[in-house]
Structure formats: C-alpha cells, structure tokens
Amino acid sequence: RDDRGTEHRFDALPQRIVTLLPSLTETAWVLGVGPRLVGVDRFSNWPADIAALPRLGGLDDAQIEALVRLKPDVVLASTSARSLDKLESLGFRVMRLKSETHADVRRTLGLVAQLLGTPEAGERVWVQLEVQIAAAAARVPAPLKGQRVYFEIGGGPYAAGTRSFIGETLVRLGMANIVPPDLGPFPKLNPEFVVRARPDLIMGVQREQAALLARPGWQAIPAVQGQRVCGFASADYETLIRPGPRLGEAAALLAGCLQRLAVEPAR
C-alpha cells in the first residue's frame, strides 16, 4: 500500500522500473535493483551509472508517451506528482510515496525494498543511516549546539522547517531552527520573517549566497554580521535536499560546515 492508500499487488517481482524523483532513483539503486531501472526523471544524477538512462521529465510534466514505450512494471513517484493520472488510466502501476520526514524515508525504504524483492535491505540501509547521523552529531562542536539555523531551499523564499527531514537532521545534530513546527515542513517565508528571527547560522546553496547576503535588511541578522553562513556547492546541496538513502552523507556535510565555522573567527 503506497502513501495514497493504493494497494499494489504483483504476480511477479517488477523487472522494469521507472523512478520520477531523484531520491527514489537513489533508493532503488542503494537497495540493489539499479540494473532494473529503465528510465528516470530529468534531475536524477546519482550514481553516475544512471547517466545513460532515458530522461522522462518530472513530477508535473512526465513524458507519458515515452513512459508507455518503456513498458515499466512499476513507476515510483511522489504523492505530489500530478501528471501520472493518464498513465494509471492506461493500466500502468504508479506507486506514490511521500518523502518529507525521516519517518517517510524509512517507510519508503521498506516499501520499495518489499516491492522489489529485497525486504531485508530497507531496514539494513536505515540502520546504516542512523549510525552515520549519530557519527555526524558527535562531530558538531559543543559551542555551536543549540544555535538557531535558517536553512534556505534554493534561492528562497522556502525554508526547511523543524518537521522536514532536513530540520530533523539538524535537530539530531543538536541545532535549533528558526521555523516553528506549526509552519510545516517546507514553509514559504517572508524575508522579513527571517530578519526578525535573527538566525545565528544560515545554510543554503553556494550560488545564491552573494544575493542572500545582499538582501535589504539582512545585514542586521547575526549570521550575516558574523559571516556564519554555510554555502554548499551544488552537488553537496542536492545531497542535502534529497530525502533518501544519503541522509547520513547529508548529516556529515552539515557537521563538516559546522566544524569549519567553529574554527573560523567570528567577524
């Protein structure tokens, strides 16, 4: 049963798999069924082994005709995918999975592992992720624990809230979040909200860092004044914002930046 409540029954293990979300592509690969992938979304880029696979659009513009030609046994997609109703009407199986929290990631690993015939692999991967996150938490310098973080999604105005998988990782690392839980996992924020919240640390993608620091009024933010900003290279940022089997790697990236900030003099 997927996260829309749809029950899926298969007479045989799916041999031809399409994934329409990078985290689901990565999940299938880590669970050991990468060779069964026959197509992926346009944003999937890890691991490098998938580079030659057909690209089939995204959640909102999946290339239905190309998908039909591939004759997949199952399509793995997000619950928010709006372009796959036609594919389902043609009799294809679409398994829709939610990925906003750590619990979602764990459930997705289990569901996909069961679907693809490797039921024990899902929990094994999750246990490895837990170990990696704990190891990252142990690396966070004590003086930074409890500091309040603003994690920006893309170039804004969305943020990773306390209830998102990113926010949950930050909590595991001992950090606080300027976004209150009642705003949801990935709320749209007014820039003035961030100014008023006065985060101690800002995290986001490196290519947006200069524009972020130059926003009106943001010079009053403690994180900007002290240049306490984690700007991640695009490849690392993609790891951070994908709710899948690289959560442990993401935690290590966050911890690494916090370690660097701890040894750099505040400005």
Predicted regions and their residues:
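Alpha-helical, coiled-coil/dimerization segments enriched in small aliphatic residues
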Residues: F43-W46, A159-F186
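N-terminal hydrophobic or amphipathic helices and topogenic motifs
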Residues: R1-Q15
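A ligand-binding cleft/hinge motif common to bilobed small-molecule-binding domains
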Residues: A81-S89, L201-I221
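Short helix-initiation/N-cap motifs at beta->coil->alpha
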Residues: D3-G5, L56-E65, D182-P191
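Extracytoplasmic substrate-binding proteins
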Residues: E7, V74, R82-Y158, A176-P181, ...
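Short helices/loops that flank or line small-molecule/ion binding pockets
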Residues: I64-P72, S89-L90, K188-R198
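A short, structured surface patch at a secondary-structure boundary
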Residues: R16-L70, V74-S80, I178
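Short secondary-structure boundary segments
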Residues: L21, T79-S80, I153, D182, ...
